[in-house]
């Protein structure tokens, strides 16, 4: 920490110590300190008394520049008590009839009033009241559309929502409040929106980056937003020339979300987009093990590890929390071959914004 010294020196008018003294401000570099007395200094052969004030100056603050597209990002523009009220424009089931559960893709109007970015989330406040007679609390959902929306006019926002229905320990069928509210919405219905929120999952700025996306189920939402911007849109300030590699894990092939869209992207940019599905109830690896997302990744383990050593590789993980441990297990053994502690290395990646996780 830098120090600044201001010295006030009291000197007699002459060499006589009986004469009055005067105080002068003297530059520190002109002072010669005498060992015989901490209070005395000599200036041009004259002895005087010094009073010095030492102040410290805080070091200049280092401004951290994010590697992500965070310029002018907006968060929490709309709160639960004053949400934005949009309308449902489109609500379509995107899973097959034999899929274990329903997933819906929905588009809401925003009229440009909810300025979100790829990788952010919005909150939804479902209609009605809870068992205590209070309004329902908001639920957060990852945005499934790019910043300009599915219609390309920056006036809509899209979600990918799985209908939650389960049987509790008492044998009662329980329906998730918000997911069922959303999946049942009809075009024209009003929907209360909060946010946008989140900076963890923002896209990298570098258009030449390697972006590895690991998603399960509706965790595909932020990656759809990334990939639309990369391959379906034209931007003057962004043209993706790197590698986007998507791993998507689902239980059945009828649960593969946005499959046709992703295949079109791969056809359009085969050198820049790689696509790998892991269908756990239908596929197995060469050991006969079910094909979970980490099982599929293990087939490319060495290649993935080499990519993770580069400072322009960014990993994004979104979906079920269970996949995180499976992926760590793969990386632990790979890193160990190079004498690297994976958990410590992952901390380094997180600090560098290269390992980004949003699981539930």
Swiss-Prot record:
Gene3D superfamilies: Nucleotide-binding domain of ferredoxin-NADP reductase (FNR) module, Translation factors. It is found in: Plastid, Chloroplast stroma; Plastid, Chloroplast thylakoid membrane. It is a peripheral membrane protein. Changing residue 360 to G: Results in a 302-fold reduction in kcat for the diaphorase reaction. Keywords: Chloroplast, Electron transport, FAD, Flavoprotein, Membrane, NADP, Oxidoreductase, Photosynthesis, Plastid, Thylakoid, Transit peptide, Transport. FNR is probably attached to the membrane by a specific binding protein. GO terms for molecular function: ferredoxin-NADP+ reductase activity. FAD binds at residues 139-142, 160-162, 166, 177-179, 218. The keyword rRNA-binding does not apply. PANTHER family: PTHR43314. The keyword Translocase does not apply. NADP(+) binds at residues 142, 162, 218, 250-251, 280-281, 290, 319-320, 358. Belongs to the ferredoxin--NADP reductase type 1 family. Pathway: Energy metabolism; photosynthesis. Changing residue 360 to W: Results in a 2.2-fold reduction in kcat for the diaphorase reaction. The gene is PETH. Its main location: plastid. This is Ferredoxin--NADP reductase, leaf isozyme, chloroplastic. Changing residue 360 to F: Results in a 2.0-fold reduction in kcat for the diaphorase reaction. It comes from Pisum sativum. One of its GO terms (cellular component) is chloroplast stroma. Its cofactor is FAD.
